[in-house]
């Protein structure tokens, strides 16, 4: 049945359970064997076990063994798939031929398997015994085209020669050849210990049917000898060995190697090595190794770069590496380990280099994880060398690393440079407030390197980092202006020199009071003082006679306080003006010193000489308001610029409470200046005087200031000190101390900007208006005075006067605020009066704005030499609006 046509693969499984002979026949003296022959394939021999098992039946020989082989059959061969099974009696000697005991034919049909007992018939067709056999013929599909075609009958099936999974004896050379010959055969080894077996013997090729009637001994012996040659050597049961017919044994041996390789490749089950941590390199597919090695070729250099840095800088990455080591430790990585191990890595951790290196390789092959680690290293300012593989979407993470020489500084270099510049400026400006707050000879250090730390932990609302950064982005020009102000403030601090420390609220009050008092009396005492401020102060001091003596003194004190207050307001809006009045004596003394020190400021004020009457009346009004209820407001044209707040009428203090109403003229004046000079003056003062959030917030919202402002009016002694001339020194000292103290005491206070919120101010103004209508009337009168004072100021048009007026406005504003802070009623009443005065005096205020804008701009340009500082006028204008329009707030 040889054919070259492509056949189909079949699996034949045979299991002999037992063989029983008839009673008349004695068991085979020699070892019995069952031979199966199918078509022209070599016979399959099944031998009983060496140690016979229990007999299933009386007189039965227990086998319990079988064979299994793969066959390639042409479809035509399936027309009569008969299996011949024969019971043979093996000869005792090697020379004697085996004897045939009985045989039977079994019809093979591809099926799931059948079990049956078949009758064995002897040569004469007599019944000689029974064969219990299980057989199964399974079609496996078309034969693989890759299997080489063999010469001759290519359909001989493998003869499985050994039993049970063990081969007790080595195979002979003859046996080995047929075994390798099983080209297409795959040994599906049958379970050996199955008890139910069936057997069959293939029909001899020469005889179409090998029936019991065939008594040709030669044929039987021939096929039997062939079977013995293949299987006698093996006493095992199930070891499979492909066998070929004797005629083609040599030809098959030439192809045996190819078949063996095919068997190994196709029959080897290799589970994915990914699921196993301890795989040997031999089991790793070559393709897999190549894929893994590709990305790792350039890694050793990178690893050397990465790990020294990571090792030294970011130890947290080590546990990550160790945890990944077990996962990544795989044969693909092992070949590269000796190369990839970096010098720094060996010292990095006790882990062996393989364990250490494998996680690195794993990370490199995981772009997202690698990017995450690099991003973390960047956040820690510890950049890692650029990895070999960078995900295209993550390339931006690695750009900054290659730029700088030092990986730790690469990521932060741009931001640090900016922040360093800002911090240097900021520190310098922070030093200025400190020097003012710490006047004890510390100001000389301002020009030096920034202080290592801010000692008192104050919030210095100078040019803060936040403000600097914000201005840098939004308004660079304004940033330049602020920096100039910082420099100017620094120079003023140096000029002021050491100053006396006063309690925060006392210092603030005294500084403001001293400034307000000192401004009028200094001119009186020292009208020819080198400071340009003195003439205007003299004019202002001349005004007090117009008012009652007490009033004039109070007004002078309030005026000096207003001038100092204006500086304080610029510095930080120290305590309420009344508090300043209470401590006018100290402030006046300080202001005397300050005048000598701050000659530049005084000189700027000195040039303009305004009618003393207008300025003094307002100050006297303030002092009188402290002493009693005053509705009279005297405009101070001479001090108009410096004392817009002084011009603001001091509303009648209800129940002896000082009610300070900032005149609408002052408000309007402050407003025109506000857009240019008001911002400049306020910002200058704030930055220049070491403005601190506490002081600023105190002026706006501190209740302490209110309580302090109550005693503040009792500053008649302050007025006297102003007359003595020590007011200047005290006022300057009080300013500095007030700034420091106010910052300390009012550190809890709300920020200045929040205090100036229009909503809250409107609410307060309404409540204050409702609370005190009399104060509103007084404020109206004050607004009239302020308008008159504005007209006088216009006539004067003196830049020094404008500066003095700004100071006066600031001081008066502070006085108002303090009076309002002393008591809610007081605060309400002055604020209400401020609002009322502001409303009626809108025209005058507008005029004042125009005048103040021109005068203050000129004055600040002369005094500070900073024409760009006119922006402070805007701030001033806003402050004026807040103070006057919104009585609840003071600037």
Curated annotation (Swiss-Prot):
Keywords: Cell cycle, Cell division, Cytoplasm, Cytoskeleton. Pfam families: HPHLAWLY (PF14925), MAP10_N (PF14924). Residues 577-592, 645-658 have a biased composition (Basic and acidic residues). GO terms for cellular component: centrosome; cytoplasmic microtubule; midbody; mitotic spindle midzone; mitotic spindle pole. Residues 325-355, 401-457, 504-679, 702-844 are annotated as: Disordered. The keyword Transmembrane helix does not apply. It comes from the Eukaryota. Microtubule-associated protein (MAP) that plays a role in the regulation of cell division; promotes microtubule stability and participates in the organization of the spindle midzone and normal progress of cytokinesis. This is Microtubule-associated protein 10. The lineage of its organism: Eukaryota, Metazoa, Chordata, Craniata, Vertebrata.
């Amino acid at each position: 049945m040889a054919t070259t046509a492509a056949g189909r693969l079949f699996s034949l499984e045979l299991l002999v359970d037992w063989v029983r002979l008839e009673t008349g026949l004695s068991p085979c003296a020699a070892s019995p064997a069952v031979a199966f022959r199918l078509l022209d394939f070599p016979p399959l021999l099944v031998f009983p076990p060496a140690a016979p098992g229990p007999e299933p039946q009386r007189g039965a020989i227990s086998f319990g063994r079988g064979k299994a082989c793969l066959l390639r059959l042409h479809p035509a061969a399936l027309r009569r798939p008969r299996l011949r099974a024969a019971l043979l009696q093996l000869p005792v000697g090697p020379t004697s031929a085996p004897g045939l005991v009985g045989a039977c034919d079994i019809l093979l049909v591809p099926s799931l398997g059948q079990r049956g007992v078949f009758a064995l018939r002897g040569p004469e067709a007599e019944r000689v015994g029974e064969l219990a056999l299980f057989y199964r013929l399974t079609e496996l599909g078309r034969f693989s085209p890759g299997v080489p075609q063999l010469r001759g009958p290519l359909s001989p099936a493998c003869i499985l020669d050994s039993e049970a999974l063990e081969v007790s004896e080595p195979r002979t050379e003859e046996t080995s050849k047929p075994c390798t010959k099983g080209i297409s055969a795959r040994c599906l080894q049958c379970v050996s210990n199955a008890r139910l077996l069936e057997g069959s013997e293939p029909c001899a090729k020469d005889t179409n049917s090998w029936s019991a009637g065939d008594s040709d001994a030669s044929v039987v012996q021939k096929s039997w000898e062939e079977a013995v040659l293949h299987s006698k050597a093996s006493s095992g049961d199930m070891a499979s060995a492909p066998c070929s017919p004797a005629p083609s044994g040599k030809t098959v041996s030439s192809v045996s190697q190819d078949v063996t390789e095919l068997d190994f490749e196709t029959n080897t089950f290799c589970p994915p090595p990914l699921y196993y941590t301890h795989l040997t390199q031999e089991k790793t597919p070559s393709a897999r190794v190549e894929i893994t090695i590709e990305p790792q070729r350039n890694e050793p250099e990178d690893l050397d770069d990465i790990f020294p840095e990571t090792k030294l800088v970011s130890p947290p990455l080590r546990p990550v590496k160790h945890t990944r080591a077990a996962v990544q430790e795989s044969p693909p990585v092992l070949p590269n380990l000796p190369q990839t191990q970096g010098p720094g890595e060996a010292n990095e951790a006790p882990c062996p280099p393989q364990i250490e290196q494998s996680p690195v390789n794993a990370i490199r092959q995981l772009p997202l994880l690698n990017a995450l680690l690099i991003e973390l290293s960047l956040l820690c300012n510890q950049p890692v060398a650029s990895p070999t593989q960078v995900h295209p979407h993550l390339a931006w993470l690695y750009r900054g690393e290659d730029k700088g020489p030092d990986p730790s500084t690469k990521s932060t270099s741009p931001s640090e440079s900016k922040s360093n510049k800002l911090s240097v400026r900021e520190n310098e400006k922070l030093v200025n407030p400190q020097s003012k707050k710490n006047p004890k000879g510390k100001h000389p250090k301002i020009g030096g390197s920034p202080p290592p730390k801010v000692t008192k932990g104050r919030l210095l609302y100078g040019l803060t980092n936040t403000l600097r950064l914000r201005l840098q982005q939004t308004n660079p020009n304004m940033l330049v202006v602020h920096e100039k102000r910082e420099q100017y403030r620094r120079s003023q601090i140096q000029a002021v020199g050491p100053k006396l420390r006063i309690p925060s609220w006392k210092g603030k009050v005294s500084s403001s009071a001293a400034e307000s008092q000192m401004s009028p009396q200094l001119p009186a005492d020292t009208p020819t003082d080198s400071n340009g401020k003195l003439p205007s102060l003299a004019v202002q001091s001349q005004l007090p006679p117009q008012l009652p003596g007490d009033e004039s003194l109070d007004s002078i004190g309030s005026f000096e306080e207003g001038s100092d207050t204006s500086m304080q307001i610029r510095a930080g809006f120290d305590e309420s003006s009344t508090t300043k009045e209470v401590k006018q004596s100290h402030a006046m003394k300080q202001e005397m010193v300050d005048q000598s020190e701050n000659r530049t400021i005084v000189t700027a004020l000195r040039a303009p000489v305004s009618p003393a009457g207008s300025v003094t009346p307002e100050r006297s009004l303030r002092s009188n308001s402290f002493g009693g209820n005053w509705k009279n407001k005297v405009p101070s044209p001479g001090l108009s610029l410096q004392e817009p707040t002084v011009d603001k009428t001091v509303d009648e203090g209800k129940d002896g409470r000082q009610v300070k109403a900032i005149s609408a003229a002052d408000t309007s004046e402050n407003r025109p200046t506000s857009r240019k000079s008001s911002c400049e003056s306020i910002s200058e003062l704030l930055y220049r005087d070491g403005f601190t959030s506490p002081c600023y917030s105190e002026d706006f919202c501190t209740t302490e200031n209110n309580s302090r402002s109550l005693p503040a009016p009792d500053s008649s002694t302050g007025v006297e000190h102003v007359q003595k001339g020590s007011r200047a020194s005290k006022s300057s000292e009080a300013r500095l101390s007030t700034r420091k103290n106010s910052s300390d005491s009012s550190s809890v206070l709300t920020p200045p900007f929040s205090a100036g919120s229009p909503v809250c101010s409107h609410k307060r103004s309404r409540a204050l208006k409702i609370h005190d209508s009399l104060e509103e009337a007084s404020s109206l009168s004050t607004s009239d005075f302020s308008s008159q004072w504005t007209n006088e100021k216009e006539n004067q048009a003196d830049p020094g006067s404008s500066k003095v007026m700004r100071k006066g406005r600031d001081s008066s504003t502070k006085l108002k605020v303090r009076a309002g802070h002393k008591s809610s009623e007081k605060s309400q009443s002055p604020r209400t009066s401020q609002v009322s005065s502001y409303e009626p005096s809108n025209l005058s205020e507008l005029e004042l704005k125009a005048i103040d804008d021109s005068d203050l701009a000129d004055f600040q340009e002369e005094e500070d030499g900073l024409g760009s500082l006119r922006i402070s006028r805007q701030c001033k204008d806003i402050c004026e609006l807040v103070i006057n329009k919104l009585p609840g707030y003071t600037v």
